[in-house]
Amino acid sequence: MKKFGNYILTAGLLLGMLAVPVQAEEVSESTVLKLREQPFLTAPDMAVMPKKFLYDSGIEIAYPEDGVKGIYLTENTAANPERVDELIGYLNSNDLNAMVIDIKNDHGHVTTDFNSDDAHIQKNTIPVISDINALMKRFEEEQVYPIARIVAFKDSLLAQEEPGMSFLNPDGSIWEYGNGELFINPFLKETWDYAVNVGIEAAKVGFKEVQFDYVRFPEVFSNDDNGLFYDMGEFADLDLTPTEKRVKAISDFVAYAREKLMPYGVEVSVDIFGYAATVSEASGIGQDFSAISNNVDVISSMIYPSHWGPGNFDLSAPDLYPYEV
């Protein structure tokens, strides 16, 4: 979790405008001491932005003092008040304090009615959670820290509706993952805005953290794109390799999401593959741990044993050795 201190801006501005000459006996001429590489005047960070400038959802839930420790709920579970109460009791009995809830699920449905102006949200909403405001009030009563899970680029629903926003096979059909799942294209700004707009709606009803999952290209790109056809949008003309373009697209999306969500006072988190933290970049899927970490508050690294291949950690089959992994 990133925490940021306050800065004395006046002194910083003064120093930033001065080039300070430093005299040394061995050097006969003045040397300019560079005090700072980056400009002092930048967009305000959420952590130092006065609260009065942040959107007020009306839901007051403090960030847990001892850190976030919680459980995951599907939209169907979250829609059941009796089950939610049972799970709140479970949290209270086990030193837990948070719930992650599917708000845009793995198929592509938005799971509650936000009355949003976004056309994709309107079209793809199935309001399984019929009263999101009542749920948020219940969380407020118990101080349960609510996290909205938003599946970003795995979206079979939108891919079927808008094939041009997905990846196409040479015969014009939509490329499918082995289990039939479809992805939308992270190169396209429209896919960014869809995920971010769902996040904004979640923040407005009271969620305190927006967690983006499937923030990546499909794994087919880990080897090659198998002759797929897809639009690179504004990344097409960049003087970068296809690998570099994928990494930039994912890193830029994360930065964009955090910027857009900043006025709503929420933490921004992402789920990434565990191995992405052990390599300089997972270039096939576009995940660069360092670049992503610069633009989020939280990273959930997926270290499941099944995500590691033969030979990782000197194990022939890591999935068979969960404790060693």
Give names to the regions the model predicted.
Residues V84-H109, K204-E209, V298:
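Catalytic domains of carbohydrate-active enzymes, especially glycoside hydrolases
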Residues N115, S156, E161-G164, K208-T243:
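Active-site-proximal loop/short-helix segments
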Residues K69-A78, S116-I129, N179-D193, D239-K248, ...:
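The substrate-binding groove and active-site-proximal loops of carbohydrate-active enzymes
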